[in-house]
Swiss-Prot record:
This is Protein SOM1, mitochondrial. It holds the Pfam family Mitochondr_Som1. It is found in: Mitochondrion inner membrane. Keywords: Membrane, Mitochondrion, Mitochondrion inner membrane, Transit peptide. It comes from Kluyveromyces lactis (strain ATCC 8585 / CBS 2359 / DSM 70799 / NBRC 1267 / NRRL Y-1140 / WM37).
């Protein structure tokens, strides 16, 4: 199970990303599956995260997935 991710508003995310200099973009592909009676039908979707080192040495992951990520 993935560690919990804080949910932040866009303005808060942008402020946090401006402070981080050592950031890299990470992606994760998940599947959303549904059973249609005979088979499972799974649709992959991508999630994007900005992974930044903060001043105290911790790693901060901020999800930056938007509506255009999976188009």
């Amino acid at each position: 199970m993935a560690p919990p991710t804080k949910i932040l508003g866009l303005d808060t995310q942008q402020r946090m990303l401006q402070r981080g200099e050592n950031c890299s973009l990470k992606s994760l592909v998940q599947n959303e599956c549904a059973f249609n009676g005979n088979d499972y039908v799974c649709t992959p979707f991508k999630r994007l995260f900005e992974q930044c080192m903060v001043k105290d040495g911790r790693v901060l992951n901020i999800e930056v997935t938007n509506l255009n990520t999976n188009r």
